[in-house]
């Protein structure tokens, strides 16, 4: 079992296929997704990787958070989450995951906080039909109707569907298809809609109901060494061309 990723919802667009069909997609961005910590069986009692994404100003962090990111030697992150993995799915602290972690045609489960709708009535929140438009109904056209029975049980049962706060719930959408990936820009294009508002953080994991493709990288799709912060190779002195003198400069 391999790790998921943290992605930011950027919005929706459409992609045209080779046969002329256009597919509605949600664009997800992977912003500096790095391993912040490891959880190991002998020390923590379970196996997981802790990922961080985005960037945060140090002045906006608490002292424990600054120490946590400093120990991992990664820049402060705006969002942190853990993903359970198998023993062979552990990653080194500081490793950065790219959009190549997923492949086109793969199915994923996406978890996020749904859009908040505020205080909503029964018709909007639960799809109630409401009361009649005429025939003696006044003012109560969009009301709930009856909420109980009679003297027995003499109460309204818990979890009765009523008006109340709607949305802003942690929800998971399953079996969403990855239509396309863009590793250079760190983008995932997912077919259809996903939970949450623009700019919200999402957890993207391999589908639990549909097996991942065999060509999906394991344990993860990491950014190549060429894109890392490693020091550039030194150029021999004899190969370095001397700068040419131009007008206004001393040769």
UniProtKB/Swiss-Prot annotation:
Gene Ontology biological-process entries: translation
Gene3D superfamilies in UniProt: 3.30.160.810, Translation factors
Any GO CC annotation of this UniProt entry: cytosolic large ribosomal subunit
PTMs per UniProt: Methylated by PrmB.
Regions of compositional bias (Low complexity) in chain numbering: 231-251
Pfam families named in the record: Ribosomal_L3
InterPro entries per UniProt: Ribosomal_uL3, Ribosomal_uL3_bac/org-type, Transl_B-barrel_sf
Region spans: Disordered: 214-251
GO terms of molecular function: rRNA binding; structural constituent of ribosome
Assigned keywords, A-Z: Methylation, Ribonucleoprotein, Ribosomal protein, RNA-binding, rRNA-binding
Modified residues annotated as N5-methylglutamine in this record: 151
Role: One of the primary rRNA binding proteins, it binds directly near the 3'-end of the 23S rRNA, where it nucleates assembly of the 50S subunit.
Homology family: Belongs to the universal ribosomal protein uL3 family.
Cross-referenced NCBIfam families: L3_bact
Subunit structure, as described in the record: Part of the 50S ribosomal subunit. Forms a cluster with proteins L14 and L19.
Name of the protein: Large ribosomal subunit protein uL3
Naturally occurring in which organism (per UniProt): Rhizorhabdus wittichii (strain DSM 6014 / CCUG 31198 / JCM 15750 / NBRC 105917 / EY 4224 / RW1) (Sphingomonas wittichii)
Chain's gene name: rplC
């Amino acid at each position: 079992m391999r790790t998921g990723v943290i992605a930011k919802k950027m919005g929706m667009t459409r992609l045209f296929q080779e046969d002329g069909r256009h597919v509605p997609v949600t664009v997800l961005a992977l912003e500096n997704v790095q391993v912040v910590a490891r959880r190991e069986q002998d020390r923590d009692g379970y196996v997981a990787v802790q990922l961080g994404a985005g960037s945060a100003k140090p002045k906006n962090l608490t002292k424990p958070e600054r120490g946590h990111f400093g120990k991992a030697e990664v820049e402060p992150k705006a969002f942190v989450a853990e993903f359970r993995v198998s023993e062979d799915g552990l990653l080194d602290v500081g490793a950065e995951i790219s959009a190549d972690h997923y492949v086109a045609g793969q199915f994923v489960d996406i978890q996020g906080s749904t859009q908040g709708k505020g205080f909503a009535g029964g018709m909007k929140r639960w799809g109630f039909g409401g009361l009649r438009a005429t025939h003696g109904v006044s003012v109560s056209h969009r009301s709930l109707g009856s909420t109980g029975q009679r003297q027995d049980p003499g109460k309204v049962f818990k979890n009765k569907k009523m008006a109340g706060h709607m949305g802003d719930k942690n929800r998971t959408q399953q079996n969403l298809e990855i239509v396309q990936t863009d590793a250079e820009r760190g983008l995932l294009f997912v077919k259809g809609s996903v939970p949450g508002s623009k700019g919200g953080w999402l957890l993207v994991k391999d589908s639990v109901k549909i097996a991942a493709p065999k060509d999906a990288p394991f344990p993860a799709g990491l950014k190549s060494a060429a894109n890392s912060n490693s020091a550039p190779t030194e150029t021999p002195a004899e190969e370095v061309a001397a700068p040419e003198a131009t007008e206004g400069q001393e040769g």
